Structure formats: C-alpha cells, structure tokens
Regions:
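Terminal amphipathic alpha-helical/low-complexity segments used for targeting or macromolecular assembly
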Residues: 1-68, 178-183
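Left-handed beta-helix
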Residues: 68, 74, 79-80, 85-86, ...
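Short, basic/aromatic-enriched C-terminal tail that caps enzymatic domains
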Residues: 167-183
Length: 183
C-alpha cells in the first residue's frame, strides 16, 4: 500500500499520509482513478476469489473512469509516484510506465500496428513528463527523464533526457526533466 502513498505524495508535493489519500480521493477525479487502479492490483487475489467480486469492482472502476475522462487499462503496469496533472481525454492502454511519471490531459498512450506485423505498446521510463495532447504509440521506448512536449506525436524510440517537440516529434535537447523533480 506504500505505492498509494507515493502517488498521493506526488499530488500533494510533499510526504503524503492516509488522511491525504482520503482528501484527494474525495476531491480529485484523476487521483480517484489511480487509487482504484492501485487497489485493484493490491486486491486482485482477493477479488478473484469472490464470485462477481472482480465484476463489481470493474463496473465501479469504469464508472469512475467515465466521470474523470480517463481510460486507464487495468492491464497497464505503472510504477510508484504516478500523477495525472489534469484529467480528461486521457487514454492509457496496456503499457509499461516507470516511476514518477506525470501525464497531462488529452494524452493517448497505447498500441499501434498490426499484431501479425509486430505492432506493440510503448514502454515509458522513470521521471518522464508527457505534455497535453501528446500521442505515444507503438512498440517504442521513452527513456528516463524524457520530456514529451504538448501535441507531440511520438512513434519512435526517444533516448533518456530528450525533450521532444510537437509534430512531428523531434528531439529539441538532451536536458529532459532535469530540475523538474528537484534533482
């Protein structure tokens, strides 16, 4: 359950408590989604033993996702310290996301290509920021501390510390998120 505290700490901007978890769950639609995602993964073994347990949870989760405008696949693998900066228009498929990732609104992260032709989903590194309106698709890797700018369309690997601008996604520098997370 410490992973939930690491998420709420990102929302709060300092060390989070269970009181903060309650506060953000009640007041922040985007935190509500990541909180329920975490609960599902913590309680999966319990939910799967209860007849219709997973079904009831899944219905509630989908309801909360619709309310917030965030479609987050329960099959995604997300590291600790995750934060939706804003909510609305966010689609995250079955992808891998590292620690301390920030995602802004209207972002799409997911599968591209055809199954038979080697399509796939992205892997996002640690300390990555993905700006508003960005699209990151395909079997690609976004390196640690990369910054994907607003409205960028990314379909190829991005090295660590790269800053990617809008269409087409071009590397603008190699300073990434340096200073963004206080390091």
């Amino acid at each position: 359950m410490n992973i939930i505290l690491s998420d709420v700490s990102r929302y709060k901007g300092s060390k989070g408590t269970w009181k903060d978890v309650f506060k953000y769950y009640v007041t922040n639609p985007s935190f509500r989604v990541i909180f329920l995602y975490r609960l599902y993964h913590q309680w999966y073994h319990i939910l799967s033993k209860i007849p219709i347990g997973k079904d009831i949870f899944s219905l509630y989760y989908k309801h909360i996702c619709r309310q917030s405008g965030i479609q987050l696949s329960l099959d995604a693998e997300i590291g600790e310290g995750f934060k939706f900066e804003h909510f609305g228009g966010i689609v995250i498929g079955s992808i891998k996301i590292g620690k301390n990732c920030n995602i802004f609104h209207n972002v799409t992260l997911g599968y591209a290509g055809r199954w038979q032709n080697g399509g796939g989903s992205p892997t996002i590194g640690d300390n990555v920021v993905i700006g508003a309106g960005a699209v990151v698709v395909g079997r690609i890797t976004i390196g640690d501390s990369a910054f994907i700018g607003a409205n960028a369309y990314v379909y190829q690997d991005i090295p660590e510390n790269a800053v990617v601008g809008a269409m087409p996604g071009k590397i603008l520098s190699y300073h990434g998120t340096k200073g963004y997370f206080g390091h």
